[in-house]
Amino acid sequence: MDFGIGFLSNNVMLPILDFFYGIVPSYGLAIVALTLVVRFAVYPLSAGSIRNMRRMKVVQPIMQKRMQEIQQKYKDNPAEQQKAMAEVYREFGNPLAGCFPLLLQLPILFALFATLRGSPFADVNYQINLQIVPPDQPVLAQPFATKPQNIYVDEGVHFPIQAVVPSGTRIPVGQMVDLQFQTKEGKPFSELVAAYPNSHLQPKWQIIRGQERATIDREGHLQALQPGEVTVQGTIPGIAADKGFLFISALGHVGVIDQGELFITLPDGARQFNWGAIHWDILVMILGFGVSLYVNQLLSGQGSSNNPQQQTVNQLTPIIFSGMFLFFPLPAGVLLYMLIANIFQTVQTFILQREPLPENLQKLVEEQERAEAIKNRAPLPFEGKGAKGAKATKAKGNPSS
C-alpha cells in the first residue's frame, strides 16, 4: 500500500477538492480553496521557518565572530571547541532548526503539486515498454498492468485506472494485440465512461519510440512489424483540462507559446510572427510568480547581502525560477496554485516580520542600528577627523552608554 505522495494525493487532496467542487462547481475555485486549506494547514510549520530565519539574520554577524574566536582559542582542543560552540547555539539558536519545519511540510506540498498535475486538470499519460521478438521465438503470455492512476470520468467521480497488455510485453512479429484501460478489478474504461452520459472521454494511443517496429491506432490495436524495443504511450484527457477560470482560458493548457503556430504564412508568401500563439494568461501567472518571489525576498531580507556576488545571485533568483517555467512548462492549473501559494507566503512573511523579537535579540538589533548610525554620521564641525571612529568604537564596546 502506498503511504507516500500518492496516498496523500488520493486520500487527502482529492476528497478536499471534491468537497469544494460540490459547493461551487468550478475547478478553478476548487484549486484556490484547496491551496488555501493546505497553506493554512502548514502555516505553523512555515511560520517557524520564517521566524528562525529572521532570528538568524539578526544574530549571524555575532555568531560568526564568536565562532571564529572559539576556533582560534581552542584550535588544539577539539572537545572544548565543540563544547563552546554548543554554548553559542544554546544562546542564539541553531541555524539548521528552521529546516525541520520545512522538511515536515514538503510531502504535503508535493502531494498538492502532484494532484494538480493529474486528472481532472491535465491529461494523464501511461507508458508501456514492449519487446518485439522474432516470430519463431517462444513467448510466455503474462498479462502486464501499469501502476493505476486516479482518473476523473465525470465531475466529482474518479476511479483508479491502469493500462493493460493482456498478452504481456513480449510480442512476436506479425501478432496483433489490444492495449486497453481498465480498473484494478478488470472493468473496461469504456464501460465506466458509458455509465456517465456527460462524459465524452476518448483515450488515445501512440508510439513514441520505435515507430518503425510497430503500428498502433488511437484505439490501442497494435501490430508488431519487426524485432526491437517499442515504447507506447496511452493518454486519457482531463475532464477539466479545457475549463477556464477568471483570465485563464484552459486550466490544463501547458506552455506559453504554441510552437507549431508561432509563425503564419501571409497570402503573399511572407512569414509573420503570430501574436495569437502566445498564451498571455500563462505568461501573466509566470511573471506574477516572479514578482511575488522577489517581494518575498525583500520582506525576509534574503535579497540583501554585503557580498556583491551573493547580492547578484539573490537578485537573479526570481528571474531564474520564473524563466524555468518557459523551458519546463507546467499546466495552467499548477501555475495558478504556485502563484496563490507564493502570494500567501509573501503575506505571511509580511505579518511575521512585524512580530516583536525576543528581548535579547531586540537589544542586539538596537546596538547594531546605533553603531551603524554613528558610523554613517557625518562629523560635526568641531569634531576632529578621528572623533567619529573613536565614538563608533566606544559604542561597540559599551552599547549601553
Swiss-Prot record:
What is the protein's membrane topology class? Multi-pass membrane protein
Q: Which Pfam families match?
A: 60KD_IMP (PF02096)
Q: Does the keyword Transmembrane helix apply?
A: yes
* Regions that span the bilayer: 12-32, 96-116, 275-295, 319-339
- Provide the alphabetized UniProt keywords: Cell inner membrane, Cell membrane, Chaperone, Membrane, Protein transport, Transmembrane, Transmembrane helix, Transport
Signal peptide residues on this chain, from the entry's feature table: none
Q: Does the keyword Cell inner membrane apply?
A: yes
Where is it predominantly found?
membrane
Q: What does this protein do?
A: Required for the insertion and/or proper folding and/or complex formation of integral membrane proteins into the membrane. Involved in integration of membrane proteins that insert both dependently and independently of the Sec translocase complex, as well as at least some lipoproteins. Aids folding of multispanning membrane proteins. Probably also aids protein insertion, folding and/or assembly of membrane complexes destined for the thylakoid.
Q: How does it assemble?
A: Interacts with the Sec translocase complex via SecD. Specifically interacts with transmembrane segments of nascent integral membrane proteins during membrane integration.
This chain belongs to which protein, by name? Membrane protein insertase YidC
Q: Give the species this sequence originates from.
A: Thermosynechococcus vestitus (strain NIES-2133 / IAM M-273 / BP-1)
